[in-house]
């Protein structure tokens, strides 16, 4: 879809404003160390942990006290039947029995939920958290293509969680059956959502802004799709400025890239060997040659005479001047010529007989004029060929100008307003051409003999691109840290090991993805503590804060006081763990980071 001329619809993407931003994220321009923070930012493990927390909490939230009590009574009766004659009422027996039940319930939950959720989180679906982060960081807009859920995938996964398949078909294990059915229903809802939403890649979609409705929409495979606005861009005079980190870094990134490109050009130019031939541009150079010949030999030298003739012919531009040169040459040479007719007689002997000097003059003049005539004819042929080439080049230039006019008209029709190019961000070779066309262009100048020439281009100059890269690294880190509030995890030496989501990062980045993109309104955002813990650690914390654990604690308290003491100690330990996680300093997190984030 292309906007019609005069339409209020403006193409936002792809354009010269948006495509370079995604190319920067892909490392096409000046990929520096600080940009690796973006890889941590787009880590899909954070959303996977949130899905895990949601599924695990929901699975344990539907069980009832009666179901827990019924399962406990059934378990306790089975223990009594197997250990007849034992001291059923002893504290040790009761504590051992209840502890066995608690541990087996936990192991069953891990086998039923933990292992299967691991498998689900690694199932390939349409929804991509990484592409969502790329769109937010680049342009602040997220296109969404909503289709029908993948029923085949949903059925293949949820079929594994029927009561019959896991051995809960009888009236026993009421608690586990409730957990299983609740988990299956919630899993079905989540899978239908994540298989029906697709975030296209930046090369697959076009984004537009409708000025009449002030709304954004996209086109994906010929279909109109929704565009969610996370950070609204600014459109002014046909130019689009995105409210995004990469937009703010764009000029600095391109400046660093062009500086490195300039350094590469200097390296290539300075690597090749260079030689300079120094000589005088004076027109009196041939006179120096004649003086040298005269000084080297005082005798008459035919080569010197011929060279002198050629030089004098080159100096004269008129026919009369050339005639005078020939006459002077013949006069000088004839002084050394013996006229055979005068000496021996004969040869006609009449007054009209041609002398040797006259014959020489006639022959030299004829030869010279013949050479000049041939040269003039060659010049006319060359001029004729050049005229033909000129006509051909004019036709080519006219054709190129016609194509250029058509391209400019097409750009204007698409709403592309011409803007002044920046010397820092445009192509280096084009920038050099612009410099040569400007008033700063170099001009030729004559250099007097004996003077020295100082030209900086002959020095091994390389722009300081390393310092620029270091500055860009610091700017990347500052922009990402301040925009998304990431938390660095450092060791005792002050070295950063990795970064993790803070609570502000969860709210700023994961919140819109959960509630605006996927529209999972019943899902709670995870805390920053869970963003870097392993799934086993998260499962332990969720289990000890669940409704099931509270009911089991109450049953144990009423069954045996010793079990109550056990639960009190476990509760104190579980309460201390999250508190320690919330108050832990970055250096303390280094103990968890020895193997990196999970």
Curated annotation (Swiss-Prot):
Database matches in InterPro entries: Herpes_Portal
Example GO biological process: chromosome organization
This protein's UniProt keywords: Coiled coil, Host nucleus, Viral genome packaging, Viral release from host cell, Virion
Source organism superkingdom: Viruses
Pfam family, one: Herpes_UL6
Protein location: Virion; Host nucleus
UniProt xrefs under HAMAP family: HSV_PORTL
Stated role: Forms a portal in the viral capsid through which viral DNA is translocated during DNA packaging. Assembles as a dodecamer at a single fivefold axe of the T=16 icosahedric capsid. Binds to the molecular motor that translocates the viral DNA, termed terminase.
Oligomer and partners: Homododecamerizes. Interacts with terminase subunits TRM1 and TRM3.
Name listed for the protein in its UniProt record: Portal protein
Species of origin: Equine herpesvirus 2 (strain 86/87)
């Amino acid at each position: 879809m292309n906007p019609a001329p005069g339409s209020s619809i403006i193409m936002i993407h792809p354009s010269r404003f948006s495509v370079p931003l995604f190319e920067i994220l892909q490392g096409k321009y000046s990929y520096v160390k600080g940009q690796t923070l973006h890889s941590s930012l787009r880590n899909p493990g954070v959303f996977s942990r949130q899905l895990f927390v949601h599924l695990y909490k929901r699975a344990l939230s539907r069980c009832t006290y009666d179901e827990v009590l019924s399962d406990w009574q059934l378990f306790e009766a089975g223990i009594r039947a197997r250990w007849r004659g034992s001291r059923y009422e002893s504290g040790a027996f009761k504590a051992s029995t209840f502890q066995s039940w608690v541990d087996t319930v936990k192991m069953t939950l891990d086998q039923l939920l933990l292992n299967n959720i691991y498998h689900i989180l690694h199932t390939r679906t349409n929804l991509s958290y990484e592409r969502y982060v790329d769109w937010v960081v680049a342009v602040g807009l997220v296109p969404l293509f909503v289709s029908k859920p993948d029923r085949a995938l949903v059925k293949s996964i949820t079929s594994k969680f029927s009561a019959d398949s896991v051995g809960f078909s009888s009236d026993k294990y009421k608690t586990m059956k409730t957990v299983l059915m609740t988990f299956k229903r919630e899993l079905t809802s989540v899978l239908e959502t994540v298989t029906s939403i697709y975030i296209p890649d930046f090369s697959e979609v076009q984004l537009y802004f409708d000025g009449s409705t002030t709304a954004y929409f996209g086109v994906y495979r010929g279909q109109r799709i929704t565009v969610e606005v996370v950070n609204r861009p600014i459109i002014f005079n046909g130019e689009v400025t995105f409210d995004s980190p990469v937009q703010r870094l764009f000029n600095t990134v391109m400046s660093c890239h062009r500086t490195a490109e300039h350094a590469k050009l200097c390296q290539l130019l300075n690597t090749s060997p260079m030689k300079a031939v120094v000589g005088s541009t004076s027109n009196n150079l041939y006179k120096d040659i004649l003086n040298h010949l005269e000084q080297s030999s005082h005798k008459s030298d035919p080569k010197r005479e011929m060279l002198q003739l050629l030089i004098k012919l080159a100096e004269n531009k008129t026919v009369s001047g050339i005639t005078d040169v020939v006459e002077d040459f013949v006069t000088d040479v004839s002084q050394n010529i013996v006229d055979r007719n005068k000496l021996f007689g004969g040869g006609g002997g009449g007054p009209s007989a041609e002398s040797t000097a006259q014959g020489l003059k006639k022959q030299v003049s004829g030869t010279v004029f013949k050479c000049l005539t041939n040269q003039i004819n060659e010049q006319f042929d060359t001029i004729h060929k050049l005229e033909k080439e000129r006509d051909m080049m004019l036709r080519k230039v006219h054709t190129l100008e016609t194509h250029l006019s058509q391209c400019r008209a097409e750009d204007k029709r698409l709403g592309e307003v011409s803007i002044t190019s920046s010397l820092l961000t445009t192509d280096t070779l084009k920038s050099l051409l612009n410099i040569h066309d400007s008033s700063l262009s170099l001009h030729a100048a004559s250099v007097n003999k004996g003077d020295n020439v100082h030209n900086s281009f002959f020095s091994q100059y390389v722009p300081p691109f390393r310092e620029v890269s270091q500055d860009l690294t610091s700017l990347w880190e500052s922009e990402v840290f301040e925009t998304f509030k990431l938390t660095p995890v450092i060791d005792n030496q002050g070295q950063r090991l990795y970064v993790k989501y803070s609570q502000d990062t969860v709210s700023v980045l994961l919140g819109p993805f959960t509630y605006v993109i996927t529209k999972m309104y019943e899902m709670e955002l995870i805390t920053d503590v869970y963003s870097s813990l392993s799934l086993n650690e998260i499962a332990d914390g969720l289990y000890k804060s669940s409704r099931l654990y509270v009911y089991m604690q109450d049953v144990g308290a009423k069954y045996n006081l010793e079990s109550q003491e056990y639960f009190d100690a476990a509760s104190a330990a579980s309460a201390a763990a999250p508190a320690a996680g919330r108050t832990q300093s970055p250096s303390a997190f280094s103990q968890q980071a020895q193997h990196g984030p999970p």
